[in-house]
């Protein structure tokens, strides 16, 4: 199983995804690390990315997912995945990929972003992310998690929902705590 943790910048993707990966002993990949340097510099400079900027990045994420699938590996990956078209690229017809949407108000997320200092994404771009955001629809089968709680509580909610959804599938045995994989 592969879990994509999505949401706007500052929603807690990195923290929740790392907790999920640690709980299951799965691989973890920060989607931001796959951005071309030009994208990072553009965002650092306060310029929102365009679709044309994002397509190569999204294809890299899809390639990462396909590599895990080819090797039979489970993993957790973060990606803002703001539009349905972006999610179609990274999830597509990959039935073993689950989508987790970390949902929160712009005000709450802006406060969180203001408190962090080591990330390239400035708070000034948050409004553009919310303007771009197309929330997942029921046909995408997202696990929607309100980000109002502590990160551990959010991760636990995701674990319970993944276990519930997978109770009758091959993935059920892989949704138990396991050893940490680098």
Which role does the model predict for each range below?
Residues 115-157, 165:
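Small-molecule kinase domains that catalyze NTP-dependent phosphoryl transfer to phosphate-bearing small molecules
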Residues 93-112:
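Conserved phosphate-donor/acceptor-positioning beta-strand/loop module used by diverse small-molecule
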Residues 5:
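Hydrophobic anchor at the beta1->P-loop junction of P-loop NTPases
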Residues 13:
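Conserved lysine of the Walker
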Residues 8:
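P-loop (Walker A) phosphate-binding loop of NTP-binding proteins
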Residues 52-94, 102:
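Glycine-rich phosphate-binding loop used to anchor ATP phosphates in small-molecule kinases
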Residues 2:
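Walker A (P-loop) ATP-phosphate-binding motif of ABC ATPase nucleotide-binding domains
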Residues 18-60:
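Conserved substrate/cofactor phosphate-moiety recognition/catalytic segment
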